[in-house]
C-alpha cells in the first residue's frame, strides 16, 4: 500500500462511497510549537549525556528555526500542485521536481542571524560562508543536498542548509489542501508529501493510540505504517527489536533480516515527550550497536549528515 494526496472534492466523492477507513494515513505538521518543543527535548536529553554540547547546539538551531518561522510566514496556493501530483501519482512537494522559491534562502539567512551571536567559534566560518555565497551557489548546494550528494555539500554546510530547506518544506506541508488516502502501490518507505526518507517512527498515544507513523526527515509530516512490518522493504518474517536498556525502553531499533536495514521506533506510551528527531539523535549508541550487528540505517537525521 502507498499513500497519495488528492484534492478534497475527489476524497469527498470516495468518502460517500465508503472508501475511507478510520485510520488517518497522513498527519501534516503542526508548526505552532514543533521546533521550540524539540529544543526543549534536546536540552532535557543533553543533561548528563556524552554528547551534551552537540545536543545543546542542536537545541539552539531548533530555536533558530522556530524564530525564523515566526519572522518569515509563508502563504501559498498549493491546490494546483496537489491536483497535478494526484493526476501523476507523485508526491505534491517532491524534492526533485518541485520548483523552489527564494523563500527558503530567506529562512537560511534568518537562521544564520539567530545563530551567529551564540554559535561556537568553529561554526562561525561555516555560517559566514553560507551567508556570503551567491544565491545561485546556494541553490546548487540545495539541489545536491536534496539529491543525497552529501560529499558535494559537506556535512558542516549540510546541517544549516537542511535546517532552512526543512523549515521551508514544513511550511508548505502544513498548508496542503485535500486529504490523503491509502492506495495499492509502492514507495511506502518514503514520505508521500515530499518523497524524503524518514528520520524515525513513532508509536502514538491519544487519538492515534497504538498506531505507528514514520516521521519525515524533511517536511515533518508523518505517514502511517503498520507495526511488525519492515518500513524499508515491508517484509515481516525476520524482524528483531533492539534497545540499550530494557524491553520497556522508549526507543528501540527494528531490524529486518530480509533487507538488512533498521529504523528506530519511539514509544509515546513509554515516554510521552519523545521527539522523532531529538530522541533519534540522542541514541547514537544504539546506531553503533546496530552497525556492529551488521545492519544499515534506513533513515536520515537532519542533525547528522554523512561526512565527505
Swiss-Prot record:
The gene is fdhE. CDD domains: FdhE (cd16341). The keyword Cytoplasm applies. This is Protein FdhE homolog. GO terms for cellular component: cytosol. It holds the Pfam family FdhE_central. Its main location: cytoplasm. It comes from Edwardsiella ictaluri (strain 93-146). InterPro entries: FdhE-like_sf, FdhE_C, FdhE_central, FdhE_N, Formate_DH_accessory. It is found in: Cytoplasm. GO terms for biological process: protein maturation. One of its GO terms (molecular function) is ferric iron binding. Belongs to the FdhE family. The keyword Repeat does not apply. Keywords: Cytoplasm. Necessary for formate dehydrogenase activity.
Amino acid at each position: 500500500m502507498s499513500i497519495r494526496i488528492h484534492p478534497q472534492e475527489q476524497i469527498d466523492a470516495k468518502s460517500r462511497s465508503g472508501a475511507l477507513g478510520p485510520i488517518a494515513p497522513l498527519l501534516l505538521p503542526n508548526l505552532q510549537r514543533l521546533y521550540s518543543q524539540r529544543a526543549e527535548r534536546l536540552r532535557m536529553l543533553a543533561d548528563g549525556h556524552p554528547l551534551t554540547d552537540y545536543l545543546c547546539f542542536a537545541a539552539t538551531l531548533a530555536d533558530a528555526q522556530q524564530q525564523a518561522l515566526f519572522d518569515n510566514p509563508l502563504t501559498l496556493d498549493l491546490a494546483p500542485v496537489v491536483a497535478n501530483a494526484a493526476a501523476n501519482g507523485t508526491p505534491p512537494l517532491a524534492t526533485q521536481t518541485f520548483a523552489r522559491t527564494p523563500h527558503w534562502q530567506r529562512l537560511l539567512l534568518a537562521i544564520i542571524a539567530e545563530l551567529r551571536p551564540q554559535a561556537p567559534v568553529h561554526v562561525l566560518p561555516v555560517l559566514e560562508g553560507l551567508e556570503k555565497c551567491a544565491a545561485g551557489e546556494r541553490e546548487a548546494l540545495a539541489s545536491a543536498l536534496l539529491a543525497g550528494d552529501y560529499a558535494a555539500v559537506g556535512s558542516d554546510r549540510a546541517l544549516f542548509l537542511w535546517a532552512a530547506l526543512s523549515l521551508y518544506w514544513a511550511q508548505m506541508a502544513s498548508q496542503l489542501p485535500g486529504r490523503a488516502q491509502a492506495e495499492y502501490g509502492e514507495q511506502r518507505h518514503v514520505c508521500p508529501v515530499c518523497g524524503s526518507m524518514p528520520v524515525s517512527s513513532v508509536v502514538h498515544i491519544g487519538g492515534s493510540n497504538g498506531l505507528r507513523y514514520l516521521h519525515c526527515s524533511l517536511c515533518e509530516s508523518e505517514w502511517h505504517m503498520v507495526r511488525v512490518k519492515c518500513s524499508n522493504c515491508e517484509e515481516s518474517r525476520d524482524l528483531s527489536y533492539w534497545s540499550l536498556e530494557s524491553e520497556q525502553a522508549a526507543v528501540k531499533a527494528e531490524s529486518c533480516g530480509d533487507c538488512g536495514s533498521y529504523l528506530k521506533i519511539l514509544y509515546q506510551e513509554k515516554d510521552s515527550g519523545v521527539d522523532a528527531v531529538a530522541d533519534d539523535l540522542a541514541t547514537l549508541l544504539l546506531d553503533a550497536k546496530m552497525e556492529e550487528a551488521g545492519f544499515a540505517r534506513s533513515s536520515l537525521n537532519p542533525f547528522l549528515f554523512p561526512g565527505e
